[in-house]
Amino acid sequence: MIADKLFEKVEKNGVVCVGLDTSLDYIPEEFKSKFSNESDMLFAFNKEIIDATLDVSACFKVQIAYYEALGLKGLEAYKNTLSYLREKNALIIADIKRGDIAATAKMYAKAHFEGDFESDFITLNPYMGMDSIDPYLPYIEKNEKGVFVLVRTSNKGAQDIEYLEAGDGKKVYDVVGEKLNTLGKNYLGKHGYSSIGGVVGCTHQEEAKEMRDKLDTMPFLIPGYGAQGGTAKDVASYLKNGNGGIVNSSRKILLAYKAMEDNKNFAECARKEAISMRDSIREAILK
């Protein structure tokens, strides 16, 4: 199961998930000047970040919107980035947040679990219900793939829907999490975690322990660290024995060179930030 590969990557390299949400204005001007087209520039920047952080991260999350916004040349960079990650045997999360049913969802599954855009995990939006998850299950069962489904997110607007009362003292996010956790038990790996994970933001620490205890077999993709205000202490509460999830950081890693005095090598700065993040979370877990 892909869940086992993720668990073992975390054990080896730590919980950091490097977010390749690469905006053109994140790229240093000196580096930009070397390229005549945006596709090559984006891919070359990503490649430098990947090489610098591969051995200090569990996986990479590639947010497709940053590439779609540039049209075909952006999608070419997206494709090349995924291909390079596969070449490096890195685990890939395609952050696509799809949420449809039936034939449409089958095509989304085919598009992102096969071919040019193949990834190990994708993100999904469950708003349409559990049948929006069904078309991905054959890939989870037979093709070593996985999904991270939105459960309780880190944005302020999460209060608008995710926190609505759903009866029996539960909120909407509780119901979503419980349904996914139950489904996920059909796809458990040898380490006790499922290939059906949840996106759980780290900016609401007061619910952390309860969620970790209830969603006992669900690996968490944890956004909100760094730029959104989440701390190592916040993150530690969502993990179990230092595992059971990965912690995404995008801007804080990609833009580390802007915050460091020795900022000539943006990739080396990204590596230093990833190591600092990994070590801070490890220290918080031990406290």
Curated annotation (Swiss-Prot):
InterPro entries: Aldolase_TIM (IPR013785), OMPdecase_AS (IPR018089), OMPdecase_type-2 (IPR011995), OMPdeCOase_dom (IPR001754), RibuloseP-bd_barrel (IPR011060). Pfam families: OMPdecase. GO terms for biological process: 'de novo' pyrimidine nucleobase biosynthetic process; 'de novo' UMP biosynthetic process. It catalyses: orotidine 5'-phosphate + H(+) = UMP + CO2. It comes from Clostridium perfringens (strain SM101 / Type A). Pathway: Pyrimidine metabolism; UMP biosynthesis via de novo pathway; UMP from orotate: step 2/2. Its EC number is 4.1.1.23. The active site is at K97. The gene is pyrF. This is Orotidine 5'-phosphate decarboxylase. It comes from the Bacteria. CDD domains: OMP_decarboxylase_like (cd04725).
